[in-house]
Amino acid sequence: MTTAFAFITFFNILSLLSVLTSAAAIHGDHNHVNVNKRHRNLAKSLHLPAPRAASEDQAAYIPDTSLHFEYPRRNFNINSNKYKKLTKLLPKIFKNANSITTHSWELGCFTETLLEVYNPSLTPFEWDDEYGFGGGKCEKLEFGEIPWNVLKIAKNSLIAYDWTGSPSSSSNGTTKSSSDLQDYLFNSTSPVPHISQALINGDGALGDPVSLVPAIWILSQFSKNHLVKLGLGGKSAEDYSWALGNQLDYLFSGPKAPTNNTISQREASFELWADMMYMIPPSLSYLGLSLSSEEYIKYGLEQWDGETAALLDTTVNIYRHVHDWDARLWATGNGWGVYGGIRNLYSVKASPFASTFTQQITKAESTLASVFEGLFNELDSQYLIPNYMGQDNQTLAVGDTAGTALVVAAYYRYLKICPDKVNDRLTKLAERAFDAVVAKIDKDGWVTHAVDPMGTYGWVVYPDDPDMHSPEAQAFAAKMWKARTEAGV
């Protein structure tokens, strides 16, 4: 008992120091968006859309600066100097990403990326069936095997969550429980009623908070581990599972297309964005994989297919950014789209239902092959994908490292499972694009030459602004490294 109390006290002290340090860093010299007259004037001249989210709507999340990121093991069969350079920079890249990641979609992407690099058997890419529901592996792992960084970020992302009505807030002070965590995911089986709400403030987006679904589900399962209970504290496993069920209710009650039930990216009105192809479909298919649920695998495949039908410009085989008000071909949107499709494919192929969805798999593989061809045909003279493709305005067409990195990451993942559907030309172009992204990463681990992710003054690349930092670009570079590591080329 004394040992446990000391252990908890030690972690509480560390957590307090972390919060104080983080707050000082944020209110001190950290200024990752250079707001200046030049940017404002440029945006006005380009007639760009409004920013993705206003600053006052930012999620109530403070980065935990105590997190430590190890050097990952590289693939020694890859002799590329740029690959070796990126390997050495990864801890700095992750540290920087952690320092500026605060919004719902950023947190979802960051936690997924950390899992891919450090705990890949918890992802569809190297799935271990013992992590599936009923396998019980999360409860048995020892200290060094637990994905502490992901669990801490996932827990802290729920700092503003309203736990009223949760299993642990019952009137008699005890947790209303079920033997199965999955019961809390569905209102029909939950011991306590759901209260429909998002996991985190989505800044008006219905889809973005859904990107956290895998991380919160993993947090729920690991919260049964006695070491996690001692070291992390937080809510009960049942509470986290219940919150996830609330998120699913909130998602499924949002605006949908009347013809095929494709879910909207936005809360207030029906809008389809390429971004959502990473947020919604693969989160649903991941639950399908983890729960061994054919229904959720089907949801994920159907949502990605519906979004593809609405957004793919088949004249060039490139995704439009938004189905109506921004039909331009945006690099990062295409990265979101193809990587979401890749995660979907890996989930269904790792599940027991691959043979059930043969037709959908074949269709998705064919679509991805054509989109990779279309995107790599657009590489500029630096071998980056232009921020907006097919534009006469050169400011809009500046090469974007963020979108390029995510497309390259998706391509290497695709190469691993569909080697017969690619060719040497595409693989060589992917390597050149890989090298082009790495060339733009500075010695401190900042990915430069990336689009302003918030669209503060328009989704534009400011290549000469060293203070324009992107949480997405940081995560995408790490995804690109891991994907190539596994492809082995």
Named regions from a protein language model:
Residues 271-408, 420-452, 468, 472, ...:
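Extended ligand-binding clefts on enzyme/binding-domain cores
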Residues 5, 75-94, 200-206, 267-275, ...:
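Short, charged N-terminal helix-start/capping segments
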Residues 93-97, 244, 251, 307, ...:
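A generic structural signal for nonpolar/aromatic side chains embedded in well-ordered alpha-helices
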Residues 242-262, 300-302, 306-309:
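Short, charged, amphipathic alpha-helices and their helix-cap/turn boundaries
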Residues 250, 254-286:
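Flexible, glycine-rich active-site loops centered on histidine and acidic residues
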Residues 19-46, 52:
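N-terminal extracellular "head" region immediately following the signal peptide
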Residues 39-109, 113-215, 219-239, 254, ...:
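CBM-like carbohydrate-recognition segments
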Residues 1-29:
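Fungal secretory targeting signals
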